[in-house]
Amino acid sequence: MAGGTVVTGEFDPLVFQTPWSNTLVVPYVLAAIKDAGHTKIAVISDTGGYGKDGVVVIKEQAPELGLAIVADETFNPGDSDVTAQLTKVKATDAQAVLLWTAGKEGAIALKNARDLGVDLPFYGGSGQARTEFAEGAGAAAEGFVFGTGKSLVPENWGQNTEEYAVVSDFATRYEEAYGEAPDIFAGHAFDAVTLLADALGRAGDDPDATALRDALEKTEGVVGFGGTFTFSPDDHNGLTQKDLALYKIQGGKWILAP
């Protein structure tokens, strides 16, 4: 249940991934940065698996979209201050900052940026699709834009769609069972179980690992929390950019970005 591409890229052929992968989300967010008219970006990421993997994809994709990376700064998971890195960013001619992290340090980075007077638009990915991020950053998160799955706001699918029915039913049953709304990690776990059950139904009696993998690779059009999954021998994530949406934090809550 991780968004790094290393999950399926390094451990194939027996590992499948339900979160929106970096190879899916990074170009989606970079395109949004370009569409906003920016051509020079600063990248700040953590040195954990999600951040390191994301930066690899960012460096591959940014030039293809005509985006120049004018700063590339990192911090370690657990760091309580990112001022030094942001000071370097402030000294560049960056027009936007792409923050790639999944930890609480993302909120710290935004607070540090506002304290330093880094008056640049900040962008991110699925690592910020958590209420803890918006709450932790407080007013510093105002205007932050990030890309992640449409299911963060089920109504994005349209209330008469199968996707909306699946996601809203999952959310209702989760709240009834646990007394709180599900986060994205609960949704990814739900997808893993759904996909496994679907594949087991097609894998024959008493399937071994190879038979189960083969069945998973033939998964087609299974609707889950993350979107519509269609696996193949070359794609163990199975999602597309049609399953994504762009959000903006406004008043401490996320709304669809205009």
Model-derived regions, located:
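Second-shell loop/turn segments in exported
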Residues: 13-19, 48, 155-161, 178-183, ...
